[in-house]
Amino acid sequence: MGASVKPAARRNARQFALQAIYSWQITKENVATIEAQFLAGEKYDEEEHRAAEPALAAPETDVAYFRDLLTGVVLSHTELDSKIRPYVSRPMQDLDMMELALLRLAMYEMTRREDVPYKVVINEAIELAKVFAAEDSHKFVNGVLDKAAPHVRKK
């Protein structure tokens, strides 16, 4: 990957991975099925609990990165939750589902994708929260990740 991957392609991959992770959390559907829906150009519609509108049709999307994020988060969600838990002031089951998806995605990148600077991970999570989560969720996500970063990112 390295320098040849454009930031916009990674940003799109994160956005679609977040939506796919959220879909998985809601439906508990097989990750391969969710991935296939996104690769076929579908996006999860929360209101209808079904896939809707084009997803990976964005002109620049790092599909390999999307797959890594989605599969990695789903397969390691229990471990990721244990890394998030110490930095959250309320029970994990009380977290908004989108906030949980954001934190899992960012924690996966912080712990498994050392090629991505932790400040980039935090900034991208904040930007995704501003678009997809509740009004002040970006502040919560920023606080949790800021506290966690020095403890979970290997130097």
UniProtKB/Swiss-Prot annotation:
Gene3D superfamilies: NusB-like
GO biological process: DNA-templated transcription termination; transcription antitermination
Entry keywords, A to Z: RNA-binding, Transcription, Transcription antitermination, Transcription regulation
Coiled-coil boundaries: none
GO molecular function, one term: RNA binding
Gene Ontology CC, one term: cytosol
UniProt KW RNA-binding keyword: yes
InterPro entries for this protein: NusB-like_sf, NusB_fam, NusB_RsmB_TIM44
Keyword Transcription: yes
Pfam families for this protein: NusB
N-terminal signal peptide: none
Xref: PANTHER family: ANTITERMINATION NUSB DOMAIN-CONTAINING PROTEIN, N UTILIZATION SUBSTANCE PROTEIN B-RELATED
Chain's role: Involved in transcription antitermination. Required for transcription of ribosomal RNA (rRNA) genes. Binds specifically to the boxA antiterminator sequence of the ribosomal RNA (rrn) operons.
Membership in a protein family: Belongs to the NusB family.
HAMAP family, alphabetized: NusB
The protein's name in its UniProt record: Transcription antitermination protein NusB
